[in-house]
Curated annotation (Swiss-Prot):
It comes from the Eukaryota. GO terms for cellular component: phagophore assembly site membrane. GO terms for molecular function: ubiquitin-like protein transferase activity. One of its GO terms (biological process) is protein transport. The gene is ATG10. Belongs to the ATG10 family. It is found in: Preautophagosomal structure membrane. Gene3D superfamilies: 3.30.1460.50. Its EC number is 2.3.2.-. This is Ubiquitin-like-conjugating enzyme ATG10. E2-like enzyme required for the cytoplasm to vacuole transport (Cvt), autophagy and nucleophagy. Acts as an E2-like enzyme that catalyzes the conjugation of ATG12 to ATG5. ATG12 conjugation to ATG5 is required for proper localization of ATG8 to the preautophagosomal structure (PAS). Likely serves as an ATG5-recognition molecule. Forms homooligomers.
Length: 149
């Protein structure tokens, strides 16, 4: 995928993301969103990775707690929680041919620790499906968001 394809379709990708997430906003070519499941909130950041020429899905996990009508959230880095997010009843939530390689890295744009689905997988997926333009981004988002949300 070429960078200009991503840049030209950021608004369209943000539209797809709004179907599963809240508080979706864009800043130039970076998309920020929140998704909640149970007592977990995912802080999601999507942007174009120039080296791999593919979109990159990054996220952080926040544990939500309510006590005496006060909601608090705590940043969590826990492999058990990652395993819970990407599995359902002990089985991967995505196609078994896909290894959702989730790693913890310093975010290349924000400089804070985030989990990421490795961009080489995004590049390979987009190459395999051979879609172009906004259709490729919609396919990519639906495929990988199904792992987390």
């Amino acid at each position: 995928m070429k960078e200009n394809v991503f840049e030209n379709n950021v608004a369209q990708l943000a539209h797809y993301i709004r179907h599963k997430c809240t508080n979706v906003r864009t800043e130039r070519t970076v998309i920020f969103a929140l998704a909640c499941r149970d007592n977990i909130q995912l802080e999601i950041v999507v942007f174009y990775h120039q080296t791999y020429a593919a979109p990159l899905l990054t996220f952080r996990i926040w544990q939500l707690q309510v006590s005496d009508d006060i909601e608090t959230r705590r940043l969590v880095f826990d492999q058990t929680l990652i395993d819970k997010l990407v599995t359902r009843n002990g089985s991967l939530r995505v196609d078994r041919r896909v290894d959702p390689a989730i790693t913890l890295v310093d975010h290349p744009v924000l400089g804070k620790p985030f989990y990421q689905l490795h961009p080489c997988q995004s590049a390979q997926l987009l190459e395999d499906v051979a879609l172009q333009g906004p259709e490729s981004l919609e396919f990519w988002w639906n495929f990988y968001s199904s792992v987390l949300i």
